[in-house]
Amino acid sequence: MTRKTDDIFAAPLQEMIDFKFDERVVAVFPDMIQRSVPGYGMIISNIGILAAKYAQAGSHCYDLGCSLGAATLSMRQRISQPNCDIIAVDNSPAMIERGRELLARDSQPTVPVALICANIQDVVIENASVVVLNFTLQFIPPEQRLALIKRIHAGLRPGGILILSEKIAFSEPARQHFHVEMHHDFKRANGYSDMEISQKRSALENVMIPETVACHQERLLQAGFSSSELWFQCFNFASMVAFK
């Protein structure tokens, strides 16, 4: 199927409104994420590899903020442990509806998937071996993040993992400037205009709040995780795995 091109911010907007995952975004999301997030495909692929290693028999794997289910599909295609299932959650009805269509096309549905439209803060996490927050925590208000991570830790089995991917910030101004500029250059190289980059940045300003890797790592320790590893970084995008 032909991938629809993201042109949401291609024309000047008369009034800037906060970014939201509505039907317009859902229609172009695969194109948007590939052209906007350096290394996205590698992150998705390796989420499946991590899940294959750490999924435990008879447990749940959670994809919190699943969008169209890319991480869910990656896990589904890799997990071989018996009696595992995946619980995929997103609060966008349009995302869940489209995600259900895409999952239905999977030719080897060996692992059951439950798609749930809900706020991830309201979902009960229990008997989990793998939990994924793939570019999701950054959209949760900062003051609510620790409580969510604590709930995830409490719902994980011993030996379970949390995979946390985020756009990140840097405390040193020079490093922050470098990574922001390189990200903008990455987007330009993928066909976005300066106006598109500027308008999307403004739309996300009050919605997505990045933090430093150190901030994430400290929160993971506060929540009870024994350790964490930064396993991927490209410019100001990173993914970590935390161990219970």
UniProtKB/Swiss-Prot annotation:
Keyword Transferase part of the UniProt annotation: yes
Keyword presence, Cell cycle: no
Pfam short name (any one): Methyltransf_25
Top-level taxon: Bacteria
GO biological process, alphabetically ordered: tRNA wobble uridine modification
Alphabetized UniProt keyword annotations: S-adenosyl-L-methionine, Transferase
GO molecular function: carboxyl- or carbamoyltransferase activity; S-adenosyl-L-methionine binding
Catalysis performed (reactions): prephenate + S-adenosyl-L-methionine = carboxy-S-adenosyl-L-methionine + 3-phenylpyruvate + H2O
EC number: 2.1.3.-
Sites where the protein binds S-adenosyl-L-methionine: Y40, G65, C66, S67, D90, N91, N134, R201
Family to which the UniProt record says this protein belongs: Belongs to the class I-like SAM-binding methyltransferase superfamily. Cx-SAM synthase family.
Function: Catalyzes the conversion of S-adenosyl-L-methionine (SAM) to carboxy-S-adenosyl-L-methionine (Cx-SAM).
Subunit structure: Homodimer.
UniProt protein name: Carboxy-S-adenosyl-L-methionine synthase
Biological source species: Citrifermentans bemidjiense (strain ATCC BAA-1014 / DSM 16622 / JCM 12645 / Bem) (Geobacter bemidjiensis)
